[in-house]
Structures are given as C-alpha cells and as structure tokens.
From Swiss-Prot:
Gene: rlmG
Organism expressing this protein natively: Serratia proteamaculans (strain 568)
The protein's name: Ribosomal RNA large subunit methyltransferase G
Entry's EC annotation: 2.1.1.174
Principal EC category: transferase
Primary location class: cytoplasm
UniProt key word Zinc-finger: no
InterPro entries (UniProt xref): DNA_methylase_N6_adenine_CS, rRNA_m2G-MeTrfase_RlmG, RsmC/RlmG, SAM-dependent_MTases_sf, Small_mtfrase_dom
Amino acid sequence: MSQLDLGTQQLELERYPQQEESTQLQAWEAADEYLLQQLENVNIGDRPVLIFNDNFGTLACALHSHQPYSISDSYMSQLATRHNLKLNELDPQQVTLLDTLAELPASPAVVLIRIPKALALLEQQLRALRDVVAPDTVIIAGAKARDVHTSTMQLFEKVLGPTRTSLAWKKARLIHCEVADIVPPAAPVTTNWVLDGTDWVIHNHANVFSRSNLDIGARLFLDHLPHDIEGHIIDLGCGNGVIGMAALMQNPQAQVSFVDESYMAVASSELNVEHNLPQDMDRCQFEVNNSLAGIERESVQAVLCNPPFHQQHAITDHTAWQMFCDAKRCLQVGGELRIVGNRHLDYHQKLKRLFGNCTLIASNKKFVILKAVKSGARY
C-alpha cells in the first residue's frame, strides 16, 4: 500500500492484483500528481470529466466528486479502480467505468490521459475523443518523461490539434492539447492481415499484442496444440484468438472459451471467429475476466496459455503464476495446461512445483512449449 498526499486529500492506494509487501512498485506515479495539479484553476462545472488509462484508479479516486468516466481497455484496471475506491471509502457509483470501445459522453470539460504503452491504442482513444470534444475541452496527457516522444506529440496534433509539452517534473512530463477544427486522415478500425498457411483474415483492435502479425511464440505454439479433446478448452490470455481458433479446428467436439483481461482482445477474438469460422460460433464463448475467476472447479479439459510477463510497464511473473494456479483449480483430473513461454522465464520449474509434473513438448532458441497434467492428488 502507498499513500498519496494531494494536500486537500490523502489517498491509500494499492496495486491490483495485490502484491507482496516487499515489492517496490507503487500504485501511482508522479504523472498522476502532475495531471491533478493542472486542474486546480479549471472550472469543471457540470460537464463530464473523462479519464483514460488510469491503471490503478488513482485519478478516479482523486476526482470522484466530479463523477468522472474512467475509460480503459483493461478489466484489471477496472478492478483496481473499484478496489481503491473501496479502500478509501469512496462511493463506487460516483465513477462510471467504460471500456475503450464504448461510446463516450459528449462535450467533456476535462480529459486526462495517462499515455499508454501502445501508440495504436492512444490513436484509437484520440480518434474516439475527436467525435465528442468541444472547442474548449481541456485535454492534458501525462507519462514518464522518457515515454513522451515526438511521435506522441505528432499523433495529438494529427488527430486533435496544436500541442505543447510541459517542463519535466519528478521525471514526468505533460502534453497540453487544444481542439482545432481539423479532419484527421481516415484510419481503419482494425488492422487486418492474412495468417500464413491459411485463408484466415485476422482482425486486430488497437491494443492487441503483436497486432500486425503473429508473434513468433504463437507461431511455435500453433504447431503443438492438443488434438481430439472432447470437453471444455480455454484459450487463456487469448489476444486475437488465433490459438483458440486452431483449437476449434483440431478439436471438433470441444467447446472453446476465449478469455482475456483486455476488452479489445476479446472483441478481436469474437470478430475473428465470426469472420473465419462462422460455423463454429455455437461452440465458442468470449469472456473478459481476471484470469479464470468464477470458472467452476474441475470443469475444464485443457487450458492453452501464452502468459504475459508485463503489467503495464512493469516486468512481473505475478500474472503468469495466477494463470497457472487458476488453470490447476479449473482443470479436471487428467486435464492439461499447455503453455508457450520464453526460455529465460523458467516456467518449467514453476509448473513442476505446482502440478508435480511438467513435460517439454517442443522448443527453439527462444521459446519452449510445456505441458502439465493435473493428477488426482489433493492440492
């Protein structure tokens, strides 16, 4: 837990999922403070306040009295926002949580943006704003100074209007943007490409990992998926859904769930199945979730997973470990977790410790495919 002193307000903030107390990672950054300082002399009135990419709900908590809209592609960020509102005894009904594909309220007074890691996501969000902002809307974006690039500035200017940067403060920097009467060049809603060796056209929304091609780990994984399973298969951390789609093809008697914490990932998966395997839509479920929360114990025959090792800009194996533990809980006895991962992440030892077994299915210089089977022993 970390404390943020805003002068008139003190907040207790935690990262979510909660970390071990020994972690040095806190739930807020200097960019959050810097953004909030800019609002001291702004007359917000009754018009909407929009907040983008508020990773752990810091800005939403600080501005809860203005009934802000918090927009994020991350379900985990939404859970973090609810958690920190509750932690500070703030009414969660004061904050409206929206995903990045949702319609935005018109004519906002203020827009605060935490600049995301993916420039494509930022562009999608700025284009959505272009449709609703007023000429006098105050637009301020913030990030660590090292993450504010010339390309970032150019994107604001292309989509919204004139832009200037602030001085650096505590290694954070702001972008101030004015709304101009411009028409940005047209851009497709999704990035589309043909998957090698197939006739599938893959549609990726802006925040999907490796959005313009298939990453090399997934390419290896495609060649080593289980066959002829009857029952429930989960593509966990599904991204654009290519792994789950291959599982649909190779397991014609199975039901396949596409699960991710990214709204855009799940939307991309559904779009890709609908366009490429429409006859199999009745065998599919699409779910935005925190790993496998709420999935019934011992109800799944196989979990396929390409686990992330970043949470926002931080490197962590917390998400992968949660996925592995959830998979073990949900798997039937004899069911398997099959993953692809970078060699250096040592997933083999983690799976062996958790499941009591782990088999190397395939490998190359960078990636390994591992399988762990749930035994009948108590756990």
